């Protein structure tokens, strides 16, 4: 296997693209297409955003097949945890989980929902 690309369905690619750029502290750019955008850093793909219902991908046909966020967790390992936390707090009204140390990994983490849930 060469590389894993995580693709998530979103309602508005441009809005979600800007939201994830803000969260991850990436420089602002525009997605390449209205229906698809790839977030990259240092030559690595971090996340692909795909508009629901485009390109006939069965798992991305409709968000109505499952509740938003059901079965999907995205963990981003960052070098700037405190800065990422500060950015996250500007993007949501409240975190889903406040910062804490994960007992399994021994790393600090917090949880929030993106614009699509």
Stretches with model-predicted labels:
Residues 1-5, 26-77, 83-113:
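Vicinal oxygen chelate
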Residues 16-21, 88, 117:
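Conserved active-site tyrosine of GNAT-family acetyltransferases
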């Amino acid at each position: 296997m060469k590389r894993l690309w995580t693709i998530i369905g979103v309602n508005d690619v441009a809005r979600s693209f800007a939201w994830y750029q803000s969260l991850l502290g990436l420089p602002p750019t525009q997605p390449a297409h209205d229906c698809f955008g790839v977030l990259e850093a240092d030559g690595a793909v971090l996340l692909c955003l795909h508009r629901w219902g485009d390109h006939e991908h069965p798992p991305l046909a409709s968000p109505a097949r499952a509740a938003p966020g059901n079965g999907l967790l995205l963990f981003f390992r960052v070098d700037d945890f405190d800065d990422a936390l500060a950015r996250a707090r500007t993007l949501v009204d409240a975190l889903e989980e406040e910062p804490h140390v994960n007992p399994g990994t021994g790393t600090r983490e917090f949880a929030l929902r993106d614009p699509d849930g």
